[in-house]
A protein has these predicted regions:
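N-terminal/edge-of-domain interface segments
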Residues: 1-207
């Protein structure tokens, strides 16, 4: 039985959906970024993580050791934070993209968050032999700073608001690990994200 973090998945469906269609061509996270999720404190108006002009504070994230191009340890995996500068596109808003992943192993860890509510969806895992599997995921709203079941809180920081707003609040950044099974001998080539733009992905790694 696959698991997400420590959450066991028992009865979402008893139906066999059959084989999935071929996965779309994969791209790197660096080439897929399309959301300005992190802004510099000197120019908060450049960010828009949530569609309302709010974003993560680069200065606040740096206090957790999270910086552009830096390494972040998340649930036992070494992830690389996007190298793009604050105030430029530096996260992937999920639109069904297929993202390449490096390294080997049977677990995939994401650095992620959502806006306007928690996300329930499926992460498609694509293997080098051409087959794929789907695994249910749940990602919490950044506004809560409270990870979804099976996830972890990586950082909870003050946000940057659009100019003219003055409502200080802490927002969360989360880790989420999908385990394809220790007995899985297949090699993971890529992942395909759900088609829900509220979900943002900063990094992903296989381990």
């Amino acid at each position: 039985m696959p698991s997400v973090g420590n959450m066991k998945l028992f009865s979402l469906s008893t139906d066999n959906p059959g084989p999935l269609p071929p996965a779309p061509a994969a791209q790197s996270i660096a080439s897929a970024v399309n959301n300005v999720a992190v802004s510099d404190d000197s120019n908060p108006g450049a960010g828009d993580f949530d569609g309302s002009g709010n974003s993560y504070s680069a200065g606040a994230l740096a206090k957790y050791g999270i910086t552009a191009g830096g390494k972040v340890t998340v649930e036992g995996a070494q992830l690389t934070f996007p190298s793009q500068s604050p105030g430029t596109a530096n996260a992937v808003a999920s639109q069904g993209q297929t993202l390449s992943v490096d390294d080997s192993g049977h677990k995939i860890t994401l650095l992620t968050a959502s806006n306007d509510g928690d996300i329930l969806g499926f992460l498609r895992v694509n293997y080098t032999d051409g087959t794929s599997e789907q695994f249910p995921i749940e990602v919490a709203d950044w506004f809560s700073s409270n990870p979804a079941p099976g996830g972890s809180l990586v950082a909870s920081t003050a946000w940057n608001q659009r100019p003219g707003n003055n409502s200080p609040h802490a927002v969360g950044l989360y880790g989420l690990t999908v385990d394809t099974g220790a007995s899985n001998a297949k090699t993971i080539a890529s992942i395909t994200l759900p088609s829900d733009g509220r979900l943002k992905v900063f990094s992903a790694a296989v381990h």
